[in-house]
């Protein structure tokens, strides 16, 4: 039993890494297409039918590019920083149930690496550790733009980690568990049982904080092209830069799964329709990340901090108090 469980876990880890690494590349294709559509352009069209092979071309380019390490960088930290970003993104996925359980060849498969009873806390903790990727990469790069990016990243991520944690306290109080599977079961009665209806404020707060956690527009301060070039990634090239890129897009997919499971019923009763519904919700939230980049400008760092500490955090605290009073 222990050997089969170990083998199953290894297979799950490999499948998650392979699928979401590929989805990171595919996500860039859809991002280019969405941005092009909204800006009245064509996007990728030349490499393969409808430009679909552009992803493969970009992958080959990254693998074959020279791995340049500038002279004055702090070598070991510079090299390990991209690994931290990619590794923590996939580590956070261990507590996410991507689909309902299903049976194949008489063997029941649970599409989650580990259903730990502190799943949400684990995910938030690992995402917090992921901050060290851009932070160390920027500090070790011996580049003023990278250093500014690292400072911005530390301020943004640490601040919005607080908002993220406070926003989900109210739903946790209602469900009485930190497991995402328990959250799904709590909402399995149907669309009327979704937590978003009873906790709309928590949903909005968590969704806003998700943009800061993933470093996406309008909170794209750590790699703001017109201010600090590519931010912490300015001195990186080849697959080291690619690891930062994979970590960012994998986080977008994972946070979309978490939002869908926390607030929008997840996969419901575990049926095929529920599984397809979960994937549709994830696709919508991923599209929303792309749409926001096309529609919104970046905001200033001081505006971002003002929004966090003077608007979102007080609202989150008030929401917790109101939820506690209602539940008494």
UniProtKB/Swiss-Prot annotation:
GO terms for biological process: aerobic respiration. The keyword Translocase applies. One of its GO terms (molecular function) is quinone binding. Its EC number is 7.1.1.-. It is an enzyme of class 7 (translocase). It catalyses: a quinone + NADH + 5 H(+)(in) = a quinol + NAD(+) + 4 H(+)(out). It is a multi-pass membrane protein. Its main location: membrane. GO terms for cellular component: plasma membrane. It comes from the Bacteria. The chain crosses the membrane at residues 10-30, 80-100, 118-138, 155-175, 191-211, 243-263, 272-292, 306-326. It is found in: Cell inner membrane. Belongs to the complex I subunit 1 family. NDH-1 shuttles electrons from NADH, via FMN and iron-sulfur (Fe-S) centers, to quinones in the respiratory chain. The immediate electron acceptor for the enzyme in this species is believed to be ubiquinone. Couples the redox reaction to proton translocation (for every two electrons transferred, four hydrogen ions are translocated across the cytoplasmic membrane), and thus conserves the redox energy in a proton gradient. This subunit may bind ubiquinone. NDH-1 is composed of 14 different subunits. Subunits NuoA, H, J, K, L, M, N constitute the membrane sector of the complex. This is NADH-quinone oxidoreductase subunit H. It comes from Sulfurimonas denitrificans (strain ATCC 33889 / DSM 1251) (Thiomicrospira denitrificans (strain ATCC 33889 / DSM 1251)). The lineage of its organism: Bacteria, Pseudomonadati, Campylobacterota, Epsilonproteobacteria, Campylobacterales. The gene is nuoH.
């Amino acid at each position: 039993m222990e050997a089969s469980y170990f083998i199953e876990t290894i297979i799950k880890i490999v499948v998650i890494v392979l699928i979401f690494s590929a989805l990171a590349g595919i996500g860039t294709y859809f991002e280019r297409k969405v941005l092009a559509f909204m800006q009245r352009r064509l996007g990728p069209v030349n490499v393969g039918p409808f430009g679909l092979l552009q992803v493969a071309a970009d992958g080959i380019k990254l693998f074959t590019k020279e791995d340049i390490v500038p002279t004055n960088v702090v070598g070991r930290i510079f090299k390990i920083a991209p690994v931290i970003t990619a590794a923590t993104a996939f580590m956070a996925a261990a507590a996410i149930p991507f689909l309902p359980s299903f049976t194949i060849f008489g063997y029941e498969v649970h599409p989650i690496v580990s259903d730990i009873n502190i799943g949400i806390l684990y995910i938030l903790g690992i995402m917090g550790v992921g901050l060290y990727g851009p932070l160390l990469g920027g500090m070790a790069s011996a580049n003023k733009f990278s250093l500014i990016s690292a400072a911005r990243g530390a301020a943004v991520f640490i601040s919005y980690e607080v908002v993220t944690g406070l926003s989900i306290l109210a739903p946790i109080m209602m469900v009485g568990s930190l497991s995402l599977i328990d959250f799904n079961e709590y909402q399995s009665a149907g669309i009327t049982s979704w937590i978003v209806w009873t906790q709309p404020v928590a949903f909005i707060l968590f969704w806003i904080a998700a943009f800061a956690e993933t470093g996406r527009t309008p909170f794209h301060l750590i790699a703001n092209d017109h201010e600090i070039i590519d931010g912490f990634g300015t001195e990186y090239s080849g697959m080291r830069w690619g690891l930062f890129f994979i970590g960012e897009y994998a986080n977008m997919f994972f946070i979309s799964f978490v939002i869908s499971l926390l607030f929008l019923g997840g996969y419901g009763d575990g049926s095929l329709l529920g599984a397809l519904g979960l994937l549709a919700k994830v696709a919508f939230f991923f599209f929303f990340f792309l749409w926001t980049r096309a529609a919104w400008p970046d905001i200033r760092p001081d505006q971002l901090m003002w929004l966090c500490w003077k608007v979102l955090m007080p609202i989150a605290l008030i929401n917790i108090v109101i939820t506690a009073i209602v539940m008494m």
